[in-house]
């Protein structure tokens, strides 16, 4: 399980980006990968899964 902060999330389009705490890597997140609703600056936990364009955040939930 990874930890990070929501840097951007567009409710209308259903996607955003999470910045991982330990590495400062940013990962794409789609609304289908959410456990709970998220907002910008929320601290979250998430798993990583290979997607079409690299690693995506999945199982995202507020910490």
Identify what each model region corresponds to.
Residues 49-63:
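OB-fold/S1-family single-stranded nucleic acid-binding modules
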Residues 34-45:
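Short nucleic-acid-contacting surface segments enriched for D/E, G, S/T with interspersed K/R
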Residues 25-36:
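Beta-strand/loop nucleic-acid-binding surfaces
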Residues 3, 26-28, 43:
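Well-ordered beta-strand positions in beta-sheet-rich domains
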Residues 13-18:
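Short aromatic-glycine-enriched beta-strand elements
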Residues 1-8:
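Structural detector for short beta-strands of small beta-barrel domains
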